[in-house]
């Protein structure tokens, strides 16, 4: 059905997450280890529960910079005009057991888990993952994407309803 299907995380050493996944019985469904040192793994959505999760490393010391090397974008993207109009700052997972899923992801991703009201959150340097309980659903899924709009003119040109837009069944919250 309609929902987001993949979350991609960039890190310094994707191979360490691949090893950790094996210890946690999280299966991979795709692996890539390129000659230039780029490594990536897609983890099975039934083991991650809710999405295909990809953990990628680019063999680039500046990997934490917004405009650093990204293998999957091709050879020219760093030469293109930069778009600073918006930034992705979070996602929301709808879960039939938010406590269990958030604890599993916290353990796997090495991100701190905090509880704010009845929402479990994983917090990183520049994004967060929210886990919302919905006991009426059969499957966990990515329901919302949080986007910070940095350019007011760009925001004014969008068809915004209730502080967001909907694309393929995923509500994109604009902050």
Pin down the residues of each PLM region.
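Long, hydrophobic/aromatic-enriched structural stretches that serve as scaffold segments
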Residues: 1-12
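Short amphipathic alpha-helical segments
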Residues: 3-5, 87-91, 141-143
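Short hydrophobic/aromatic beta-strand micro-patches
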Residues: 8-10, 92-94, 146-150
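Amphipathic alpha-helical segments
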Residues: 12-25, 97-112, 153
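Vicinal oxygen chelate
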Residues: 15-87, 121-137, 146, 151-175
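Surface-exposed interaction/gating patches
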Residues: 74-117
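Intrinsically disordered, low-complexity segments enriched in Gly and acidic/Ser/Thr residues
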Residues: 99-143
């Amino acid at each position: 059905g309609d929902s987001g299907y993949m979350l991609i995380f960039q890190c310094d050493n994707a191979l360490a997450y691949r090893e950790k996944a094996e210890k946690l019985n999280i299966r991979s469904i795709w692996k890539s280890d390129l000659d230039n040192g780029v490594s990536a793994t897609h983890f099975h959505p039934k083991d991650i529960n809710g999405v295909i999760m990809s953990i990628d490393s680019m063999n680039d010391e500046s990997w934490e910079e917004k405009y650093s090397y990204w293998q999957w974008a091709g050879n020219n993207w760093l030469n293109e005009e930069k778009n600073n109009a918006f930034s992705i700052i979070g996602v929301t997972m709808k879960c039939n057991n938010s406590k269990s899923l958030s604890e599993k992801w916290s353990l796997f991703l090495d991100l701190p888990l905090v509880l704010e009201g009845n929402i479990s959150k994983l917090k990183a340097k520049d994004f967060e993952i929210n886990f919302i309980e919905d006991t009426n659903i059969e499957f966990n899924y990515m329901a919302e994407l949080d986007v910070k709009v940095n350019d007011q003119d760009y925001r004014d040109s969008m068809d915004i309803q209730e502080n967001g837009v909907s694309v393929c069944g995923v509500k994109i919250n604009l902050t």
